[in-house]
Amino acid sequence: MFLSLDRTGQQLIRSVLDLYDWDWGSAEAEYKRAIALNPGYATVHHWYAWHLIVMGRNDEGIAELRKAESLDPLSLIISADLADALCIAHLYDESVRQSRKTLEMDPNFAIAHYQLGQAFAQKRTLDEAIGEFKRAIELSGNDDTFEANLAYAYATSGRKDEAIKIVNDLEDRQSQHSSTDASIAVVYLGLGDKDQAMIWLNKAYQARFNPSILVRPAFDSLRSDARFQDLLRRIGLLQIGAPNPLH
């Protein structure tokens, strides 16, 4: 499987396999080996940053993303993911500035509009959040994650009928994509329905989802819930989304 790849690429693929096995210790070891093999490779710092953020080590993750950005300053996805990490760390104003920096490079980069919308949603500037999510949907061709976040913004702004319509549509076309299950949970959190949110998170768990979504501030209202803590325990991430030590 790995014969045609250089050693750094092999380590990255192994780390991704460990992610979907939820083998966090092995994933970290693979990332560190990849960095040792090629410390100037932006992608390995980028991916390692996400591992750190999922582990609740926000300050270290942001530092790795800044390193990745310094190595590849024209990368749209690295720039956008730095904005995402800042939002996860509750550094919303910094996140907004970073998303705007990304959009200066490419005003039509859907992910940057989505990240900007997430920061606005947490700042409770909901009209702006709704506008950014709509733009992300327009540019991406109706991405489920973007639609779920639009529904979340509708729900938290009091436009619950519009949120319910979107979540019903998402449920109707939901298939085997565990990311859609977890995104539907986000909408129910916006609607204040923790029971439905947990039902959909457990569906995502059964489908072996990527749990990085759980670090996002939309899930803050669930962190003290025993059912959510049990989910994290099963994934092996009881400390997921821990507060940034810099705060």
Feature names for model-found ranges:
Residues 6-15, 23-247:
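Alpha-helical protein-protein interaction modules
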Residues 20:
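Aromatic-rich carbohydrate-recognition surfaces in CAZymes
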